[in-house]
Structure formats: structure tokens, C-alpha cells
From Swiss-Prot:
Keywords carried by this UniProt record: Chloroplast, mRNA processing, Plastid, RNA-binding, tRNA processing
GO cellular component, one term: chloroplast
UniProt subcellular location: Plastid, Chloroplast
Predominant location: plastid
Gene Ontology biological-process annotations: mRNA processing; RNA splicing; tRNA processing
MF annotations from Gene Ontology: RNA binding
Family (UniProt): Belongs to the intron maturase 2 family. MatK subfamily.
Physiological role: Usually encoded in the trnK tRNA gene intron. Probably assists in splicing its own and other chloroplast group II introns.
Lineage, top ranks: Eukaryota, Viridiplantae, Streptophyta, Embryophyta, Tracheophyta
Annotated protein name in UniProt: Maturase K
Amino acid sequence: MEELQGYFEKDRSRQQPFLYPLLFQEYIYALAHDRGLNRNGSIFYEPLEVFGYDSKSSLALVKRLIIRIYQQHFFLSSVNDSNQNRFVGHHHTNFFYSRFYSQMISEGFAIIVEIPFSLQLVSYLKEKEIPKYHNLRSIHSIFPFFEDKLLHFNYVSDILIPHPIHMEILVQILQCWIQDVPLLHFLRFFLHEYTNWNSFFITQNKSIYRFSKETKRLFRFLYNYYVYECEFVFVFIRKHSSYLRFTSFRTFLERRYFYGKMEHLQTEHLIIVCCYYFNGTLWSFKDPFMHYARCQGKAILASKGTHLLMKKWKYNFVNLWQYYFHFWYQSYRIHINQLSNHSFHFLGYLSSLLKNYSTVRNKMLDNSFLIDTLTTQFDTAVPVIFLIGALSKAQFCTVSGHPISKPIWTDLSDSGIIERFGRICRNLSHYHSGSSKKQGLYRIKYILRLSCARTLARKHKSTVRTFLQRLGSGLLEEFFTEREQDLSLILPKAITFPFQGSRRERIWYLDIIRINDLLNRS
């Protein structure tokens, strides 16, 4: 019991108990603005006809917000006013201020709660002295790891991490790390009133989706911390899985201790459940070869063990979310596939293991014999179907992949239209540079290239053929990256691998820290 208690407390010792007073500091909201938390239309610089003030008056609005936070029933009154204004249609300015204040509070709160975790990250990097830390942040850094490790693995689990169904779950997780009780009460009250405000207009199961759309940074922080807590518990279970005793299969099916419901606080509840779970008679497998990778809400769990072991971890995840986070998770959201027969979609790539058979004739003195060899290669391909679906959602083509024009961009200049289409192509080429086959990427480029031509032809009220003849090859040059032109002079166009045909060289860049927006659409 003391060992488990120490494990959960050793990383939670650096708690910051005095964060609530920062809500009343003007520089917090100025910092939120300076860091560009609202790049898609900042709430600090709204149009004059909506705001009634110029952009220099945002500081006065921040001061007014701080004064209203001191008031006892500000949130309740603002919610009632906003609901009345929504239905009646009067006092539009007051309703806008209530919505404006809620967004400002969410952004300021996101800045405050990020402070202790940022300090902890900086101190951790100084202690560990990790070289080239920025390279490890790259999304592409995970694929060389896959190339080395997944070649010898048997199964992979495709996991979709669920969203909590209630905001209180996020607050309870956060209170394990932050001891500032007034700040947690303020967050709980803000989330409660915010969801009640939107419950008049949306259903209950969409309240979190509405909250995530309007307060992106705060929800992103809460969700990322929730995922971190999931992984924190997963690492604990993984480290202690080898301590389980080997017994008969019948006791494995019972699992009576794990299903016992415990009424305790968040951390104590998990420790007690884990104690009963690990001290009970449970048949388990020791698998030292297990690897885990995650990006956003999707995770990959690969193992060298058997299918039964993967099912064990599958139900461990289900029970974890059910008894620790107190919400139901459907087991069908975790897919277990055999790596030799299935591919998995992760980080915008379709990854799989390719087996290549070859026969080598060996001659020794007067005897000759044939040797059959098998080589396995980690292959990454461009998910053409997913990208075409993303392009159709963005209105660049139809569902079947037929290019169409982009009417909303016809008001731009010709150079602006070409620059936008070219930037999309360059980003896709840069991100999918690790694909072993480029045919799918060429198809996506062709769709964007023809969509650009159709958009320009629509702007000038001409046909695509006439416009391309007048433009010449200048349009095509905009869709090549500078790196592709440089690499074509350095690397050969085709590289022959052993026991394979001619394939393109895969290149992984260590400066990509986010997924392309088109991949998120898919």
C-alpha cells in the first residue's frame, strides 16, 4: 500500500497552491492576448459596430471583468440575461458582453493553470538534460521508432480515447495536482454555469462539444491533462503487471476484486482498487516487449505477445475508464489486429508490415541448394481515400475525387489563389515525405492543381483549357517545394533495396510539430 501511495505522490509534490489571485491581475489577460490565443478572430479586437469601443478600450473591458468577478452572483445574472436576450432578441450588447466575459475568463484561466505545468516541464528538462529536445517534439520522430520496433511485433491495438461525459470528471482529475481550492471551485462554478447556459439551446450529450468549440484553449488543456492522467495510470499498471501471480484460467475470468465498487476519493480509490486487483489471484502474462504511441485522441498499443494478452489489456482499459473515471466505454472502440495481415491508420499514414519472399541459390563445392528467405519491412503509405474525403469536406473536390472550383476564393488575386493552393500542396508534400509510394500523393496534387485552375477560370469567366494555355507551366511550378527541388539534385530518383524493386527514398523531417488541417478533417 505504501509503495502504491508513493508512486502516485512522487510526481504530484510540485503543486502550486496560490493561483486564484492571478485571476484578478490584468497582465494575465494581456498575456493571453499577446500569446495569440485567439488567432481566428481575437475577442479583444472585435468590430466597432459590435463592441461600441475601439481596440484601445480592451483594457477597460478587462478591468470591468475583474470587478464583476468580485460580485457574488455575476455568473448567474449573466446567464439569465443572456437567455432572455437570446429568446427576446433585445439588448444585444449585454448578451455579447456576457459571452465576451466567459471567453476572456476561459483564456485567462487556461494561462493560469498552465503555469505550474510549464515550470515542471522546464525543471524536468534541466534535470534530465535531454539532448535535441526539439527534435523529439516532431511528429515524424515516431516513425523511425516504428521502423525499428514493429518489425518483430505480432499484434497492434487501435485505441480511441473517449471524451469525459461530464465536466466534473475533469475538475476532479485536476484537483489531484492543484491544491488551490478557490481556483478549483471557481472552475467548477464556471463550467457548471456555462453548461447550464447552453443547455437551453443544445442537448446534454453535445454540451462538451459546444464548450470545446467556443473555449478551445481551456478545453484543450483539460482534455490533454485527462489523457495524461490516463497514461499515468497505464504506466503504473504496466510497471506492476509482472508482479501478478500465475494461476489457473478460471480465476482470470472472475476478476472479482477489480469489479468491487469503492467509495473513496479520486486517488485513494484507484490505489485501493489496484491493491485488490494486484493482490488477487489473477492469471497474467509478462510481456516486456510492449510499445505505446499516441497523438491527440488516438493511441496505438503494440505487443509481441499473444491475442489473449491483447484482450487482457483491452479490458484493462475499459475497466480503467469505468471505475477510475466513472463513465462507460464501449469495448468495440478498441480494435485488435494482427500486424502481418492488417494495416493501421495513425498520424495521417497507413502503416503496415510488408513481407518479401525471395529465393537464393547457394553453391558449395559440387552441391547446390536453394534457400528461401523472408524479409519484413515497415511500410507507410498515403491514405488517399481519407485525404480525398478531407478535400471534399473542404470543397476542393467531390466525394469521388473530381476536382471542383473554390468559389469563396474567387475574390482574391490570381497570385493569392495560386499561393494558397501551392501552400496546401507544399504542406502535404512535406508531411507525407515519408511515404514509400508517391502515386497517391501525386493524385492529391493533381486534384488541388486542377481545382486551382478551375477556381482561376471561374474568376476570369473562362474555360480551364483556355486558362491553362494562357498561363503555361507557371501554375505547375507553384506546386513544388523548394526542398523537393533541392533533394532531387542530391538523392537519386530511385533507390534499389535488397530483395525489392525500385522504390522512393523515405524522408522524415524533425520540424513538424502538428498535423495538417486536412488530416484532422478526415
